[in-house]
Amino acid sequence: YPPRFTQVTTEEEALNELKNRNFELIICMPNMDNRDIFAAATEIKIHYPNIPIVVLTPFSKEVSKRIANEDLSAIDYVFSWLGNAELLLAIIKLIEDKMNAPDDTASVGVQIILLVEDSVRFYSSALPHLYKFVLEQSQMFAKEALNDHQRTLRMRGRPKIKLARTYEEAVRIFNQYRDNMLGIISDMSFMHDGVKDPLSLIHISEPTRP
C-alpha cells in the first residue's frame, strides 16, 4: 500500500500526533513558526529515538555551513529539496531498504547497490534517478511472474540501495553485505577521518577488492 502523509506546522503539533498515532518516518521541513528545523528534529528524536528522521531543506551556502558544523547524530539523513517530487519516494525507499536489507539479504539473497557520496545536493538528485531505474527494471522482471504472489516476491527481491556519506560508513556497509554486493557507485573524493580526502575512492577500493 502507498504511504500516507500527515502534515503539521509546528513542533508541538508533531509531538501531539506522535503521542497519539504510530509513524514510521518523520520528515522535517522549514515551517511557518521559524523554529530551527535541526533543533526541532533533535528534540523529537529525544522522545522517539526509534523513528527515522529526515531533514528536507532548500539548499544554500548558509545551510551548507550549518550542516558542516552541526551535530547531526539525531538526524538519519539530510536531503536538499530540488523541486522533484520523486525525491519523496526515494527517501521512503531508502528508509525501507535500510530496515529490510539485513533480513532480505539473509533470507532470500537480495543484492545491494552502494552509493558513496557526501554531497547532499548530489545524492538528493541522484537517488530518485537510481531508484526509478531499479524499480522499472524490477517491474519488467515481475511481469514475467505467473501469479500475483510471484510478482510480489520478485518486486521484494529487487536490489536494495544503501547510502554511505563517509569512507568509514562505506566500509562498514560493504563489510556487512560483502557477499551480496552488486556494485558500488562512488564519487572520487569524500569524507575520510573527518576531512575531505581527494583519494577516498582509491582508499575504499582496497578493502573492497577480493
Predicted regions and their residues:
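Acidic catalytic/metal-coordinating carboxylates
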Residues: 35-39, 193-201
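Hydrophobic positions in alpha-helices of CheY-like receiver
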Residues: 43-44, 205
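Acidic, metal-coordinating helix/loop segments flanking the phosphotransfer/catalytic sites
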Residues: 1-25, 141-183, 190-191
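Amphipathic alpha1 helix at the N-terminus of the CheY-like receiver
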Residues: 1, 16, 121-132
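His-Asp phosphorelay/catalytic-motif detector in bacterial-type signaling
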Residues: 22-24, 46-55, 180-182, 209
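Output/docking surface of receiver
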Residues: 7-9, 31, 54-122, 139, ...
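Short coil/turn segments at secondary-structure boundaries
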Residues: 19-20, 67-68, 91-92, 127-129, ...
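Residue-level detector of conserved catalytic or cofactor/ligand-binding positions
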Residues: 202-210
